[in-house]
Every structure is written in structure tokens, then in C-alpha cells.
């Protein structure tokens, strides 16, 4: 009888212990893949046909809002894109090029569930983006300008709590 009671005690203790274990959760409600980003005059990442592009990786456990902030409101030297270019490929996986040797591209939307708000002087240039839980890669495109140092701040905050991350962006000479 004592043996059965001991087995039942161990069994119920194991059931209670496993029922209290929470599923995997992120240690932070929001992460941003880089801090104090410096963009050299020669771009750190190039797009398919030479565009100056940097990708931010945002991982959040809930709704978030990302904003590009500038020292001057008319200084839109970088912006968030709602899509990015990928190379067109043939049935064998080779990149398709035109008669001049340029890679043919097609536009891909960033992600479903990401909402863009206009803020630039042209279509497709955004300063504010909202998204939901999960991981999102946001492309930021920027203009090169020789001999000029420019600044911006990329700020991401959780909309349902007082929690944010930001990175300072500097374009060097």
C-alpha cells in the first residue's frame, strides 16, 4: 500500500509541476537587431541593382509601432519601404538579366499585417509603420550624399505597454 501511495504521490507531483511550466516566451517584449547604426558613404548593404538598403529586424510579443525621426522635419534622407526587390529567376534558379546585363527584379511586400503610414514626399517613402507579434524585416532605403553627415533615430515601441527600443542612425562622410 505504501508503494502505491508513493507512486501516486510522485505521479501527481509530476502532473502539477508540468502544468505550471509556461510555454517558451521571449525574454523581452521587443527586440531590435542593431544599435547605433552607422551608414558609411559606401553603402553597407546594396540592393539587387545597387540601391542603398539596410534591413531592421523587429521581434515583438505584441503590437508595435516604428518611427523614423529626423532633426529637421524636411530632411527625409532615409525612409522605410513597404516592399523590397528580389531577383527574378528562371525554372533552374538562375537570375534573369536583360539585354544590358541588369538583373530583372520584382517587388515583394514586406509582410502581411504590417501597416504603413505616408510621411514622405513620394509614394513608397514612409516614416511610420505598425505591426503585430512576430518577426518582421523592415527595409530602410537611403540617399547617398558625399561630404555630408546626417542623423536620424529609428524608434520602435510596444503600443500596449511602456516599452521601446531605438537605434541612432548616422550617415558618415
Residue spans for each PLM region:
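C-terminal motif of bacterial Sec signal peptides marking the signal peptidase cleavage site
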Residues: 16-19
Amino acid at each position: 500500500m505504501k508503494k502505491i501511495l508513493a507512486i501516486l504521490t510522485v505521479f501527481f507531483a509530476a502532473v502539477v509541476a508540468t502544468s505550471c511550466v509556461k510555454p517558451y516566451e521571449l525574454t523581452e517584449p521587443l527586440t531590435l537587431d542593431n544599435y547605433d547604426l552607422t551608414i558609411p558613404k559606401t553603402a553597407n548593404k546594396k540592393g539587387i541593382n545597387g540601391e542603398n538598403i539596410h534591413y531592421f529586424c523587429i521581434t515583438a510579443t505584441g503590437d508595435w509601432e516604428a518611427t523614423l525621426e529626423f532633426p529637421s522635419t524636411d530632411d527625409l534622407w532615409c525612409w522605410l519601404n513597404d516592399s523590397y526587390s528580389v531577383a527574378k529567376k528562371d525554372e533552374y534558379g538562375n537570375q534573369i538579366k536583360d539585354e544590358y546585363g541588369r538583373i530583372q527584379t520584382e517587388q515583394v511586400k514586406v509582410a502581411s499585417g504590417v501597416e504603413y503610414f505616408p510621411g514622405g514626399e513620394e509614394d513608397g517613402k514612409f516614416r511610420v509603420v505598425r505591426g503585430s507579434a512576430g518577426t518582421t524585416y523592415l527595409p530602410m532605403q537611403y540617399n547617398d550624399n558625399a561630404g555630408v553627415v546626417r542623423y536620424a533615430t529609428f524608434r520602435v515601441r510596444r503600443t500596449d505597454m511602456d516599452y521601446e527600443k531605438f537605434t541612432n542612425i548616422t550617415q558618415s562622410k
